[in-house]
């Protein structure tokens, strides 16, 4: 789901960075308020776990790929703002060091996989936290919401075309991106994300229940 350089127009790049910059600033402010010596090791560990699982990409139709995120687990434990910033840092390192995702698309990738994933997961978990399926559903919705943002932005890129109608950037429209990305995440990648989140949450709960609920302390 990492969008590389060259897939989105300059106008899209500028717009996504304009949206992301104040959100990053707010997230950094929340991080400074909530991070302490006790929670830092867990945040670092979960961010590293997210980094690792996102490196395993599975190609899907429509010119992109799918993978697990780990952002739902971060959002449940630390809240959506800290989770969004943590995933943004992970995405930046992946783009800069491994070329997984473009620098021009970094803001869009962060908005999709970081902010959309974290806030959708946090919302679902908080609304259904008394239900035993809340953690799974939080993981599932984080993947689906992220894929929808990516599919939507990529799907409108063909509107930017030369006079003969040939797209200048990403060539597939919404009729391809929505079913390819959102559909695959609803039936497969989201389920994988939900299972991963549920298992990881259960492991953390057994190891250190206090640390697991750090954001509620």
Can you describe what each PLM-predicted range is?
Residues 2-10, 14-16, 20-73:
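Hydrophobic transmembrane alpha-helices
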Residues 58-62, 89-120:
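Interfacial aromatic-anchored transmembrane helix boundaries in multi-pass membrane proteins
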Residues 84, 91-92, 110, 115, ...:
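Transmembrane helix-bundle signature of multi-pass membrane transporters/permeases
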Residues 144-168:
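Juxtamembrane non-transmembrane "cap" segments at the membrane-aqueous interface
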Residues 112-151:
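Short helix-perturbing small/polar motifs within transmembrane alpha-helices
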Residues 137-140, 166-217:
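C-terminal transmembrane helix-loop-helix hairpin of multi-pass membrane proteins
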Residues 14-15, 40-45, 84-88, 111, ...:
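Hydrophobic alpha-helical transmembrane segments
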